[in-house]
Amino acid sequence: MIGKEINLLKKYPKTKRDVNKRREEKTEEHRAIARKYGKDFFDGDRKVGYGGFRYDPKYWTEVVKDISNYYELKSGDKILDVGCGKGFMLYDFFKLNPQFNIYGIDISEYAVNNCIESLKGKLKVGNAVSLPYPDKYFDLVISINTHHNLD
């Protein structure tokens, strides 16, 4: 039996930009730079990536509350974010409950090294194919907007 579909991202703010137009403006050179997932992607020009990837509570705070409530997360639970970037969503889990055990993994060494200070040591460089954790270790595993990176 297939479970019911839920949308736990419904409170994530919608973009006001024309995404299709932005996609058309990017050159193959922009895409090649972006695929390195380094400083240019996270904190460089908007045509290459995020255009300055900074923490803003408007993005994940309410989403994290909904996820936590839906899965009935409690103190001590272990949460993994695969494709965590700089760890902004994990930071909001930490703010919601500092007793959550949070872990993140991302392919970008730059993102992991430039994460929010309180997350230092909780994020690792790695990929979704070979996670450096034992099976069934986590109470919740999240991976949002990462499928395009899988080969």
Spans of features found by a protein language model:
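Class I SAM-dependent methyltransferase Rossmann-like catalytic core
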Residues: 45-58
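Class I SAM-dependent methyltransferase SAM/SAH-binding core
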Residues: 88-130
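A conserved beta-strand element that flanks and buttresses the S-adenosyl-L-methionine
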Residues: 142
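Conserved alpha-helix/loop element of class I SAM-dependent methyltransferases that forms part
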Residues: 57-74
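N-terminal auxiliary segments of SAM/dcSAM-dependent transferases
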Residues: 1-33
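A short, conserved alpha-helix within the catalytic core of class I
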Residues: 150-151
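Hydrophobic adenine-recognition pocket in adenosine-nucleotide-binding enzymes
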Residues: 146
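Conserved class I S-adenosyl-L-methionine
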Residues: 76-85
